[in-house]
Amino acid sequence: MSLTRLNIEAFRNIQSAQLIPAPGINLIYGQNGSGKTSILEAIYFLGMGRSFRSHLSQRVINNDDDKLTLFATLNLARGDSKIGLRRFRSGETEVRIDGEKVKRLSTLAETLPIQVITPESFSLLFEGPKSRRQFIDWGAFHADPQFYGAWTNVRRVLKQRNQLLRNGSAYSNIQFWDQEFVRYAEQVTEIRNHYVDSLNELLKGIIGEFLPSVDVKVSFTRGWDSKTDFAELLENQYSRDLATGHTVSGPHKADLRLRVGTLPAQDALSRGQLKLLVCALRIAQGKLLKQQIDKHSIYLVDDLPSELDAQHRQLLLKQLTDTGAQVFVTAIDPAAIVDSLHTPPSRMFHVEQGRVTVIE
């Protein structure tokens, strides 16, 4: 899978741009503030319906416009597919895939799987369990069609249960919701656990390439003691949950733990090593997606030279090339990327003040 055409209208400082990306490595270079990262952000927005740089989607709309428009043609195994998205300043979003209106943003994510490696993505190991759950759930969502529905139900039931707790409801009023919660929680946990097991098989070899002298152990924690019956736990913890006003244990507390010996990876490794570990996780996740559903991710790699030294840039770019996936990578100096590749980039784009030029 690859993008063969990308149109961007009124997205940050890009008033209008048309790109014809190539399979393989697409290098986008330009000075800071030129708009090169905005191209990556636009691709991400098209696949996720949101930005990876701002929680307020209205901020990505060009100041002179009331809406942004993104359009792409995807080359898929079954033929070409067209995706269009409009986001209005009012917050309304309009999405079409092959001319048909789409109501769920999850359909975008399913159509256009995206992996991001940016300076911010290295916070995967520092920001707490939420970002690591999102990492697991990205893979579980793509790997198992049952996951999205089960996780949606977990969130729905959890919201209802927490509301009852805040209202001080007796356990007899919560018991029905606990039966639902247990059913969906166990389904979500089984899918997550299976996904992490599959990821681990690939990850060992990739971590060995990036960090050959480090033994990293990766494990999944479900959000409650696996030796404890979840239904019994919820009943036994009712008083505690009532006191806090929320559900203390459950799949919403799951985590991906990475350890070196007895220490968490973030305490045992240097900042440079942690960056390589996150790169290994992203590479493994993309490779597993290809194995499981025969679909490539699209990789967005921002400001690579500032994050990794020349040796590790070369290693990451080799790993990305070996996946066979389409890659968009940005840099201020194109030589920092070109010199790290065994073959020239498939295509190069120069960005200046929001204007994009293809370099022949």
Swiss-Prot record:
ATP binds at G30, Q31, N32, G33, S34, G35, K36, T37. It is found in: Cytoplasm. One of its GO terms (molecular function) is ATP binding. InterPro entries: DNA-binding_RecF, DNA-binding_RecF_CS, P-loop_NTPase, RecF/RecN/SMC_N, RecF_2. Pfam families: SMC_N. The keyword DNA damage applies. The keyword ATP-binding applies. One of its GO terms (cellular component) is cytoplasm. Signal peptide: none annotated. Disulfide bonds: none annotated. Keywords: ATP-binding, Cytoplasm, DNA damage, DNA repair, DNA replication, DNA-binding, Nucleotide-binding, SOS response. GO terms for biological process: DNA replication; DNA synthesis involved in DNA repair; double-strand break repair; SOS response. PANTHER family: DNA REPLICATION AND REPAIR PROTEIN RECF. The RecF protein is involved in DNA metabolism; it is required for DNA replication and normal SOS inducibility. RecF binds preferentially to single-stranded, linear DNA. It also seems to bind ATP. Belongs to the RecF family. This is DNA replication and repair protein RecF. It comes from Shewanella baltica (strain OS155 / ATCC BAA-1091).
